[in-house]
Regions:
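Hydrophobic cores of alpha-helical transmembrane segments in multi-pass integral membrane proteins
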Residues: 1-80, 92-121, 136-168, 174-241
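Active-site-proximal inter-transmembrane loops
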Residues: 81-89
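Cytosolic, membrane-interface loops and tails of multi-pass inner-membrane proteins
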Residues: 123-137
């Protein structure tokens, strides 16, 4: 209930931000972390309706809260929003990309839970924590469903991002560091999806690969933005990309 209440207030806050900015509220790093957190909680709530696994929230909530703590520690970016950022293509781009990220965060959490549960079973530690975690089959199913839905969102986000780049910059592809790392991320998740659907990857192997893929995604989200300069740089809301 606390997580749901927080999600509702967060949703209202994001709607107010969208109305004030006239575009998706992710033009600075502070807002990006906030929106990422919101997407993760949204995806968890949807998955909770299907799987009815409350303990999943015990892993998701700290991660989402950590993102909000980072967001709150970053000062607001100053400056007006350039008209070029008030594009419906930009809104489509960031919304689909972040929803994909939220779904992949669920694959990451499910993978961590899978490895914890698997270790408890192998070591025959059947305590209270073991009984609270779902079965290995259920955790693998959560991982699978999140991947199945996350990959199309990531793909759609990259397509709409290319369209926005053409509208804003005159080219579908700029070889921006974040574009390159987004492609790397896409290729890794494509490989994971291929192995799951055609080779039949399940269990530990899929869990480990999900963790690897999400680490690459996090580097794309933060590292490729902060450490390598490009037009996706979050340096200022009035002068940077999204």
């Amino acid at each position: 209930l606390i997580l749901l209440a927080g999600f509702i207030f967060h949703t209202i806050f994001l709607c107010v931000q969208y109305a004030a900015l006239g575009t998706a509220p992710v033009l600075d790093l502070k807002s990006a972390f906030s929106f990422f957190s919101w997407c993760i909680v949204l995806v968890f709530l949807v998955f909770h309706l299907k799987f009815r696994i409350m303990v999943l929230g015990s892993f998701v909530a700290p991660f989402a809260a950590f993102l909000m703590i980072i967001s709150s520690a970053i000062p607001w970016a100053a400056g007006p929003v350039k008209p070029i950022f008030k594009s419906i293509w930009l809104t489509f781009h960031v919304t689909t990309i972040f929803l994909g990220n939220g779904l992949f965060a669920i694959t990451f959490v499910a993978a961590i839970m899978y490895l914890i549960q698997e270790r408890q079973i192998k070591q025959k530690h059947f305590g209270s924590f073991y009984s609270r975690l779902p079965s290995l089959a259920t955790l693998d199913s959560i991982n699978h469903y999140a991947l199945i839905w996350g990959f199309p969102f990531l793909t759609l986000g990259m397509i709409t991002g290319s369209i926005y780049a053409q509208v804003a910059l005159g080219s579908y592809w700029q070889w921006d560091p974040k574009e390159v790392w987004s492609l790397v991320t896409w290729l890794f998740y494509a490989a994971l999806l291929h192995e799951r659907l055609t080779v039949g990857w399940r269990g530990r192997r899929a869990a480990v690969m999900s963790i690897v893929c999400f680490c690459i995604l996090l580097f794309t989200f933060v590292g490729a933005t902060l450490w390598v300069k490009g037009y996706h740089d979050f340096s200022s809301i009035g002068t940077s990309g999204a």
